[in-house]
Amino acid sequence: MTAPSMIREYEISAQSTAVFGRVLCSARNHHFIVDGPVQNGCPGEELTPPEVFLSAVGSCGVELVHVIAKDEKMPVESVNVRVRGIVDRGNQPRTDVTTFTRVELDFVLTGVDQKQATALVEGFKRR
């Protein structure tokens, strides 16, 4: 039996639309709209790129905590995470791109005790 690969590759496409600042994104056979923020003159009606990024981090956290709980046979009932991202343009770690200077995750788990919840979140951090 072959061991699973340590390398995973993902691909999406993004293309402009007839609406300024609105982008059509596709992943596999799924499509969704992303808007630039209002301060850039964009519609700002849909999720913005930073919100999509933070949503991806949050959904990864929820899904992986459930997977780890299942593997460890822990009775987690629900996993909620609040993700907050900060972009401090005056304190960027790099000069070639603008990045989040801080991303905070706050997990709330039910069905497990504090020790189990901590172990599950730590397991997510190591993934």
Residues of each region from the PLM?
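Extended beta-strand/beta-hairpin segments
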Residues: 1-55, 66-127
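Alpha-helical metal-binding/catalytic segments enriched in His/Glu/Asp
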Residues: 60-61
